[in-house]
């Protein structure tokens, strides 16, 4: 489950940086 959470966090960070 940890890996899934990390992936979600990374995606959110990338989205914020791109935005």
From Swiss-Prot:
Disruption phenotype: None seen.
Keywords: Toxin-antitoxin system
Induction entry: The sibA sRNA probably represses expression of ibsA mRNA, either by destabilizing the transcript and/or preventing its translation. Expression of the proteinaceous toxin is controlled by antisense sRNA SibA.
GO biological process, one term: programmed cell death
Database matches in InterPro entries: Toxin_Ibs
Functional description taken from the UniProt entry: Toxic component of a type I toxin-antitoxin (TA) system. Overexpression causes cessation of growth.
UniProt similarity note: Belongs to the Ibs toxic protein family.
Remaining remarks: Part of the SIBa repeat region (formerly known as QUAD1a), encoded on the opposite strand from the sibA (formerly known as ryeC) RNA.
Name of this protein: Small toxic protein IbsA
Source organism (scientific name): Escherichia coli (strain K12)
The organism's taxonomic lineage, starting at the top: Bacteria, Pseudomonadati, Pseudomonadota, Gammaproteobacteria, Enterobacterales
């Amino acid at each position: 489950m940890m890996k899934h959470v990390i992936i979600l966090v990374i995606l959110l960070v990338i989205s914020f940086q791109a935005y």
